[in-house]
C-alpha cells in the first residue's frame, strides 16, 4: 500500500530591522551616552541576516535549521521582555498561508508573541514538508519529522490562544496537530503492512488501522463541528479537498481494520462474525470510494492510494467466506457488528516541545547574553536578590560553625597550654634528675600563674571600683541634663534612653564576673592564691619517677607522642577548615545564575524556589566537609583529654589514700572555679573599655550641649543689658516726656543662629580626653562635631535587627550595645545638632 500526505504551505512575511529596533530601545532606556555599552552591532546584524535566511528559498533542511535557530533567539528575547516586548516598537507583518479562500490575508502586530508563533508555524510546516520528501525513500524516516511537527502544533494550540491570524488560531493549529498525528500513524501502519506476511499480523494490523481511523475521525469532526455543509466548497480552514481526503482515509482504514479483524475471527472459527465484519469492510470501502470520486478533478491521491485494488481484495474475501458459511458452517451473521471493542494502539511517540526547540535555545544562550545584555527584566533582578539572600544565609551558617569550632580549638589550646605541657612532660620523664612533682599539679601551677599574671596586669581587676566609676559618670551626666533648657527636651530624652540601654548592657557585663569576684580577688593576690592551692598539695607525697618501672615510663612517653600527634591532627583540621571556608566564599562570590533565571523567567515562584534549592546543592559538599572537621575536632579533643588523664594516673604510681584522693578532688574543684573566673574576667576585660569609652563620649556630648545652652543664655542677657542703656531722645528736654529709658525687649534664645564669633576663644575642651578618644570642639558658629560612629558592618546590623538574639551570643558579647551607632547618630538630635 502507498499513500500521500496533505501538503502544507509556509507563511510569508515582510522585512524587519532588528538592529535599528534594539539600538532605539537601548537609547531610550540607557540614554545617548551609555546605550552603546550594551549594543553589539555585529551580532545585531547577524540576527537580521538570520531572519532573512529563515524566510528565504533555501532547501528544506537548511531552511528548517535557520528557522529553529531564529526561534531560539526569539525565545531568549521573550524571556527577557515578556509582555513588555511592545517596547521594541517593531511592526511584525505576516501573511496567512495560501490555503483556500482565506489564504494571503495580511496581519500586523507589535507583540513578540506574534513573531514567535508565526515562526513556529513555519517550523511545523517545514517538518511536515520534510516528511513528505522523505516519504519517497522510507516511511520509517518520515515518521519522526511528523511527530516533531505534531509537538509544535500542539504547543501552539495550547499556548497561542487569541491570535488574529487564521493560521494561528488555537482550533486550527489543533486540527493540524491531529492531522499530522493521523498521518504519522498511517505511515507506521503502512510500514507494517508492506513489511510482508500481513496475514500473520492481522490482530496487530486491526488495532493499528482502527487507531488510524479514529485519528482521522477527529479531523472529520473538526469540519462537522464548524457546521459546514459537506457539499459546500467553503471549509473553516485549509483547502476544500482536505475534507474529502480525511473522510476517505477514515473510511479506508475502518475498512482495513474490519478486514483484518475478520481474518482473526475466521482463524478462531467464528465464521458468521467474520462475514459480518467483511460486509462492514466492503461498505467502508464503498464510502471511501465515494469521497475519492470527489477528488477526481484534483488528480489527488489517484496514483498513491490503490482504493480499487483494496476494495477488490475485500469483496473477493467476502464472497468466498460467505459462500463457505452458506454451504459448510451455517454460522449466524450478526447485523449490528462493531469495532468499538477493538483496543487502540497509538504507535507515535510525540516528543516534548522543549526537546524540539531546547537545543537551539541553549545554543543561542551565549550569543544572546551579549546581544541582549542590556535587556534584563526586573523580575530577574528581584529573584537574583532572593537567591543571593539564600546564599548569604547558607554562608552565614557555615561561617558561624567555623568560628565556633575555631573558638573551641583556641580555648582548649590556650587553657591547657598544650604545646608547653607536652614538652614539660616529655622532659620530666626523659630526665630522671628533674623535679618529681606530680605532672598534673605542675600543669595546674603553670596555668594558675598565667591567669594570675593576666589579672594583676589588668587595669580593671577591681570590679567594685569599675562599677563605682560608671555610676559616678552616669550621675554626672544626669546632673548636666537636669540643667539643660526645655528647648532641648527631645535630645535629653534620647540621651536618657541611651543611658537606659547602656545600663542594661552593664548589667549583662557585670553579671558575668560578679559570681567570681572572690576568685578574681584571689588571682590578684599571689600570696593568698598559693597558700590556698598548697593546702591541697602538702598532704600528698610527690611521686618519684624512679618508682616508675621502664615499661610504665615507656608507656607514658608513648602516650605523650600519641597526644602530640593528636595535637598536630588538631592543627591540620583547623587549617583544612580555614581552606574549605575560603573555597566556599570564593565559590559563593563567583556564583551567578542570571542566565538560568532568564531561561526560567516564566516559571512560578514555587518552581523558582525549587531551582534555588537545586543551585544551592553545589555548596552542600563544602558544608559537609566543614561538619566533618568539626566532628573530628571534638573527638580529637576528647582523645587528648583522655590521654592526659592517663599520663597523670601513670605518673602517680603510689596508691593514694582516701585523704589524698579527697585532696586531689578538692584541688581539681578549686582549679575549675579559677578557670571559670579567668574566662569570665577575660570577657569582662575585653568589653569594659567599650563601655567606659561610651560613657566618656556621652558625657562630653552632654557637657557640650549644657555649655552651649549656658553660653546662649549669657549672650542674650548681655545683649539685653547693653540695649537697656540706649536712649532715642535728641535733647535733655525730651527726658521729661520720657522719664523711663526705652529698652529692647528680651530676645528668646535662637538655636538656629550662630553665637558671636568673639566667644570662640573661651571654649576649648580638647584636653578632655579619655581612653584615647579626642573630641575637638569647633567654633560655636558651627554645630558641635559628633564622635565618629563605630562601624558595625553587616553582621552588626543583623544582630541589632534580629529580635531573637541567642543567649549564647549575649554571653559571648554582652556589650554589643556599645557597638551600635546609638546616641552618636546625628539624626537623633533635632535641635542640638542643628
UniProtKB/Swiss-Prot annotation:
Its recorded name reads Vacuolar protein-sorting protein BRO1
Please give an example of a GO cellular component term from this record.
Answer: endosome
What does the record list as coiled-coil region(s)?
551-590
Where are the disulfide bridges?
none
**Per its UniProt entry, which superkingdom is the organism in?**
Eukaryota
CDD domains in UniProt? BRO1_ScBro1_like, V_ScBro1_like
Main function:
Involved in concentration and sorting of cargo proteins of the multivesicular body (MVB) for incorporation into intralumenal vesicles.
Q: Which InterPro entries match?
A: ALIX_V_dom, BRO1_dom, BRO1_sf
